Curated annotation (Swiss-Prot):
Function of the molecule: Cell wall formation. Adds enolpyruvyl to UDP-N-acetylglucosamine.
Active site: C119
Binding positions for phosphoenolpyruvate per the UniProt entry: K22, N23
Molecular function GO terms recorded: UDP-N-acetylglucosamine 1-carboxyvinyltransferase activity
Binding site for UDP-N-acetyl-alpha-D-glucosamine: R95, K164, V165, S166, V167, D308, I330
Lineage of the organism: Bacteria, Pseudomonadati, Pseudomonadota, Alphaproteobacteria, Rickettsiales
Cell membrane listed as a keyword: no
Modified residues (2-(S-cysteinyl)pyruvic acid O-phosphothioketal): C119
Coiled-coil boundaries: none
Organism: Rickettsia conorii (strain ATCC VR-613 / Malish 7)
Annotated protein name in UniProt: UDP-N-acetylglucosamine 1-carboxyvinyltransferase
Entry superkingdom: Bacteria
Enzymatic reactions: phosphoenolpyruvate + UDP-N-acetyl-alpha-D-glucosamine = UDP-N-acetyl-3-O-(1-carboxyvinyl)-alpha-D-glucosamine + phosphate
C-alpha cells in the first residue's frame, strides 16, 4: 500500500493551478442520464470521477474520454441506458453514487440504488433524499441494503421543505424535478457553488430553474432535455487547501484558475489570522507576513465556512499564537484527524462537536494515518510545517479528491513523494 514521505520546513513559493471541482462534476455526470449526450470539460483526474464513470457505464452509458495534460473531457452518451440498478460493489466506494437515483427515477420511472459508502465521517443518512422523492409521488422501500424506487407515470411537481440543509438531497431533488410534471418548489436548499454549477449545466440542457444560489429553488419540469456542452467550475476546496498550505509553511503562493468570490470566505478567515490574501487575475495570492493569530471557526452550510476545510484550518491553528475554538456543525464524526495531529505535537482537546486548539511553537514529524479525504490532506499540511520527516499511511483517500497533489506541492518547493 502506498504512503507519502514528507520532509517539511520549506516555505511554499510558486503557482498552483486549481482543477475542476469534484463536488460539481459528479452530479453533472449523473445529470447526463437526463439527456442523450452531455459533453463535459475541465473534469479532474480523480478516482471518484472514475467510479462515477464505472457506475454510468454499468447503467448502459457510452463514455468517450479525451485526456489533456491537466484535465479530462468526457462525452457521455446515455441514449442506451438499459440497467436501472446501481450495485453495491460500485456504490460502496462513493456516496455520490446516490445521485443517479433522481435521474433514473424521473426519466425511466424506476431505480434501485445500493445504500452508499464513501468517507466514514458521519451518518449522512439518505432520509431527505427519499422524503423529497416520495413527495414527488415516488414509491420507495429499503430492502436488503438497496433503495427500491418506482413511480406510476411521471414524477409530480411538489412543494418541499428540507428539515435541514442538505447538499446531497438538494442535488437529487433538482435532478428529479427537471423532468417532473409541473412545478416544484424547494425550500431550505443548499446554496453551494457546486449546486449553482449543476443548475447552470441543467439550464444549458434546457431545464427551467429559478432561484439558483438561494435557499428557495423553483423548477418547472420539462418533457425532455437537450444535448449540451458544459465546463465545470474550479474546486474551491482544493483552492482553500493550498491557501492554508501557503500559510502553514510561511510561504507565498499564487493560486490560479479559481474565481475569488467562491473562496472569499476562506480568504477572510485567513486574513483574520494575520495572513495576507489578495485577489489577483484569475485567482488569489496568499503570503505569510510573520504572524499567525488564533481565530475561532464554525463550519456551516454555504456561505458559511465549509466542513471540507475544517481539518486543514485546524492544522494551521495548531501553530497559532493563542487558543482557538473550532466548532463542527455539519458532521458529527469529523475530528478523526485530531489524534494524529496530537501525535505530531499538537495540543487539541475535543469536547463534543468542539475542539479547543492551543497553538504550539512547532509540530514534529511522525508516522500518521489518514482516516478520510480531508483529514489526510490536513496531515500533509502539518507535515509540511515541520523541520523533520512525516510518513502518511492510507493515502488512497487523497486520490478521491486531489489531482496531482504531490506534483503541485513539489512545484512550489515541497519535499514530498509517494512510495
Amino acid at each position: 500500500m502506498h504512503k507519502l514521505i514528507i520532509h517539511g520546513g520549506t516555505p511554499l513559493k510558486g503557482i498552483i493551478n486549481i482543477s475542476g471541482a469534484k463536488n460539481a462534476v459528479l452530479p453533472i455526470m449523473a445529470a447526463s442520464i437526463l439527456t442523450d449526450k452531455l459533453h463535459i470539460t475541465n473534469v479532474p483526474k480523480l478516482t471518484d470521477v472514475s467510479t462515477m464513470k464505472d457506475l454510468l457505464r454499468s447503467h448502459g452509458a457510452d463514455i468517450e474520454i479525451i485526456e489533456h495534460q491537466d484535465e479530462f473531457e468526457l462525452i457521455i452518451d446515455t441514449k442506451n441506458i438499459n440497467n436501472f440498478t446501481a450495485d453495491y460493489e460500485i456504490v460502496r466506494k462513493m456516496r455520490a453514487s446516490i445521485w443517479v437515483l433522481g435521474p433514473l427515477l424521473t426519466k425511466y420511472g424506476k431505480a434501485k440504488v445500493s445504500l452508499p459508502g464513501g468517507c466514514a465521517i458521519g451518518a449522512r443518512q439518505v432520509d431527505l433524499h427519499i422524503a423529497v422523492l416520495k413527495a414527488m409521488g415516488a414509491e420507495i422501500e429499503i430492502e436488503d441494503g438497496y433503495i427500491n424506487a418506482s413511480s406510476k407515470g411521471r414524477l409530480k411537481g411538489t412543494h418541499f421543505v428540507f428539515d435541514k440543509v442538505s447538499v446531497g438531497a438538494t442535488i437529487n431533488a433538482i435532478l428529479a424535478a427537471v423532468l417532473a410534471e409541473g412545478e416544484t418548489m424547494l425550500f431550505n436548499c443548499g446554496r453551494e457553488p457546486e449546486i449553482v454549477d449543476l443548475c447552470n449545466c441543467l439550464i444549458t440542457m434546457g431545464a427551467d430553474i429559478a432561484g439558483i444560489g438561494t435557499s428557495e429553488i423553483t423548477i418547472k419540469g420539462k418533457d425532455s432535455l437537450n444535448k449540451a456542452s458544459y465546463k465545470v467550475l474550479s474546486d474551491r476546496i482544493e483552492a482553500g487547501t493550498y491557501m492554508f498550505a501557503a500559510a502553514i509553511t510561511k510561504g507565498d503562493v499564487k493560486i490560479c484558475r479559481i474565481d475569488y468570490h467562491i473562496v472569499e470566505n476562506i480568504a477572510l478567515k485567513l486574513i483574520e489570522t494575520g495572513i495576507k490574501v489578495v485577489p489577483i487575475n484569475n485567482g488569489v495570492q496568499v503570503t505569510y507576513e510573520g504572524k499567525l493569530n488564533s481565530v475561532d471557526l464554525e463550519t456551516n452550510p454555504y456561505p458559511g465556512f465549509a466542513t471540507d476545510l475544517q481539518a486543514q484550518f485546524m492544522s494551521l491553528m495548531t501553530l497559532s499564537s493563542g487558543v482557538s475554538m473550532i466548532t463542527e456543525n455539519i458532521f458529527e464524526n469529523r475530528f478523526m484527524h485530531v489524534p494524529e495531529l496530537c501525535r505530531m505535537g499538537a495540543d487539541i482537546v475535543v469536547r463534543g462537536n468542539k475542539a479547543v486548539v492551543r497553538g504550539v511553537e512547532m509540530l514534529k514529524g511522525a508516522e500518521v494515518m489518514a482516516s478520510d479525504l480531508r483529514a489526510s490532506v490536513s496531515l500533509i499540511l502539518a507535515g509540511l510545517s515541520t523541520n523533520s520527516k512525516t510518513v502518511l499511511h492510507r493515502i488512497y483517500h487523497l486520490d478521491r479528491g486531489f489531482q496531482d497533489l504531490e506534483k503541485k506541492l513539489s512545484n512550489c518547493g515541497a519535499d514530498i513523494k509517494r512510495v
